């Protein structure tokens, strides 16, 4: 097998991330220094991000039978790298209070990011599985990184056991599809399964088992039970990565698979996805109403947000509009989640025990840190889909797609879920502006705004507001990147 120069250039983000990974391993072996580890990680991720225009200039490139680097892949690679960079900067602040080895945090982060990049360009079940495993396995260590805390170890073990079960379902589903089609390529599966009789046992069984695996990775109901415990137990920067990079990478490969394999649009699978979307929206929002822990609340909130996004897959038989809607919504979800979890990271440190995840810890924050409060307020408004924020544009797109597909009941579920979500997001905002209690509460550092994590949080808030007021740059960006090559 030979590689052309264009194919190698198309792999630049993955090659640069892998190079940073190797350089970091050598640096750790030579001399432990968390400053060096941070610089190597940030440099590698930035180089990978700034290489994306070079990748786009190569056009659509099929790199081996495993990867397709097209506009769709480049867009989601960008989201993965932005999320990883933000996680790295939040981790820098959090690790300053960490008493043990810090360098492995960055190494595990780079490995997981490489897995996300593989998923963004995957067009083969083998690369899909490799990408998911590269993304998932480092998360076991990252979730349990604060291993002196019992809740962190518990979260890591739960995530590991349940993730192993989900991987078994995914692999078994792939095996059944291979037995029926004789190929693992998305395009070959699409061509072969299109001629397979409807409701063939191997076809339905394979697609159903794969759907279970994907549903776990996206924490969709009824496979969501791990989510609140893992979000609560994971360090705040790791929860950021779980909520953004991990889910965005898995969703983008699921959407490509669904578009490439027409058999996945079988009415039975179609209605199963639709039911899962509605259940996720309802359960995610109802359980979030009951939470007094902000990380658990964000965990349940993420269940509902990916329930909304399942509506895109249900409507995706209509053409490119659902693909565009998914891109806009995930861009909004990325920046909004980075801002919200960034504030939690600013308030947390291992020196002070558990993360500042109790809602009570944020009572009266406005009177101590008004600008940090403004950032969290903007993020809550955006997640609720309030006008003049990027969240409103994302929700508008989703409702537009479901209305266009005449899925009125699904549109109603999105509206109902948004109304329920408004209540618990407003509860967080009200808590921020209450008068401070007499007792001393957790607080961010006085110079939080000039730290790398603080700058990321402020930039995220500025983008959420600016792009909510004038969304055309986002729409044009997404439209320019959404060419999906399915062969």
Curated annotation (Swiss-Prot):
EC identifiers of the protein: 7.1.1.-
Location relative to the cell: Cell inner membrane
Keyword Cell membrane: yes
Catalysed reaction, written as an equation: a quinone + NADH + 5 H(+)(in) = a quinol + NAD(+) + 4 H(+)(out)
InterPro entries noted in UniProt: NADH-Q_OxRdtase_suN/2 (IPR010096), ND/Mrp_TM (IPR001750)
GO cellular component terms, semicolon-separated: plasma membrane
Keyword NAD belongs to the record: yes
GO biological process, one term: ATP synthesis coupled electron transport
Annotated TM spans: 8-28, 37-57, 71-91, 104-124, 125-145, 159-179, 203-223, 235-255, 269-289, 303-323, 327-347, 374-394, 408-427, 449-469
Tree of life domain: Bacteria
Protein topology in the membrane: Multi-pass membrane protein
Alphabetized UniProt keyword annotations: Cell inner membrane, Cell membrane, Membrane, NAD, Quinone, Translocase, Transmembrane, Transmembrane helix, Transport, Ubiquinone
Sample GO molecular function, one term: NADH:ubiquinone reductase (non-electrogenic) activity
Coiled coil: none
The family this protein is said to belong to: Belongs to the complex I subunit 2 family.
Subunit note: NDH-1 is composed of 14 different subunits. Subunits NuoA, H, J, K, L, M, N constitute the membrane sector of the complex.
Function, as annotated: NDH-1 shuttles electrons from NADH, via FMN and iron-sulfur (Fe-S) centers, to quinones in the respiratory chain. The immediate electron acceptor for the enzyme in this species is believed to be ubiquinone. Couples the redox reaction to proton translocation (for every two electrons transferred, four hydrogen ions are translocated across the cytoplasmic membrane), and thus conserves the redox energy in a proton gradient.
Protein name (Swiss-Prot/TrEMBL): NADH-quinone oxidoreductase subunit N
Organism: Aeromonas hydrophila subsp. hydrophila (strain ATCC 7966 / DSM 30187 / BCRC 13018 / CCUG 14551 / JCM 1027 / KCTC 2358 / NCIMB 9240 / NCTC 8049)
């Amino acid at each position: 097998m030979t590689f052309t120069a264009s194919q190698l250039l198309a792999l630049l983000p993955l090659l640069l991330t892998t190079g940073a990974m190797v350089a970091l391993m050598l640096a750790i072996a030579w001399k432990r220094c968390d400053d060096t580890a941070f610089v190597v990680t940030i440099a590698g991720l930035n180089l990978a991000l700034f290489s994306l225009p070079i990748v786009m200039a190569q056009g659509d490139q099929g790199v081996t039978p495993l990867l397709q680097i097209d506009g769709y892949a480049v867009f989601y690679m960008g989201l993965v790298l932005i999320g990883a960079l933000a996680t790295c900067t939040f981790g820098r602040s959090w690790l300053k209070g960490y008493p043990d080895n810090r360098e492995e945090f960055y190494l595990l982060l780079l490995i997981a990011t490489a897995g996300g990049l593989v998923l963004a360009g995957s067009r083969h079940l083998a690369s899909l599985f490799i990408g998911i495993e590269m993304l998932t396995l480092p998360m076991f260590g990252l979730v349990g990184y604060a291993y002196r805390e019992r809740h962190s170890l518990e979260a890591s073990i739960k995530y590991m056991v349940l993730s192993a079960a989900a991987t078994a379902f995914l692999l078994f589903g792939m095996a059944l599809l291979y037995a029926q089609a004789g190929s693992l390529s998305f395009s070959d599966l699409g061509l072969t399964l299109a001629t397979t009789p409807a409701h063939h046992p191997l076809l339905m069984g394979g697609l159903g088992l794969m759907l279970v695996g994907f549903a776990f990775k996206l924490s969709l109901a009824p496979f969501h039970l791990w989510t609140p415990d893992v979000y609560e137990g994971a360090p705040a920067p790791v929860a950021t990565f779980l909520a953004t990079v991990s889910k965005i990478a898995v969703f983008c490969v699921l959407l490509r698979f669904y578009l490439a394999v027409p058999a996945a649009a079988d009415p039975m699978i179609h209605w199963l996805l639709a039911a899962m979307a509605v259940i996720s929206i309802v359960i995610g929002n109802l359980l979030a109403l009951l939470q007094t822990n902000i990380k658990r609340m964000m965990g349940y909130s993420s269940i509902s947000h990916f329930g909304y996004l399942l509506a895109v897959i249900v409507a995706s038989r209509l053409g490119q509009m659902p693909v565009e809607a998914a891109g806009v919504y995930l861009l909004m979800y990325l920046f909004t989640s980075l801002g919200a979890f960034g504030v939690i990271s600013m308030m947390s440190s291992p020196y002070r025990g558990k993360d500042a995840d109790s809602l009570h810890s944020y009572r009266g924050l406005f009177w101590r840190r008004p600008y940090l409060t403004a950032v969290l307020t903007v993020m809550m408004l955006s997640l609720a889909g309030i006008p003049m924020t990027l969240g409103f544009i994302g929700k508008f797109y989703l409702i537009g797609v479901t209305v266009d597909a005449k899925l009125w009941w699904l549109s109603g579920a999105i509206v109902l879920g948004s109304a329920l979500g408004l209540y618990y997001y407003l509860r967080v905002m009200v808590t921020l502006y209450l008068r401070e209690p007499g007792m001393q509460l957790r607080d961010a550092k006085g110079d939080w705004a000039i730290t790398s994590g603080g700058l990321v949080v402020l930039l995220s808030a500025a983008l959420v507001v600016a792009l909510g007021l004038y969304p055309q740059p986002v729409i044009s960006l997404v439209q320019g990147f959404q060419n999906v090559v399915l062969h």
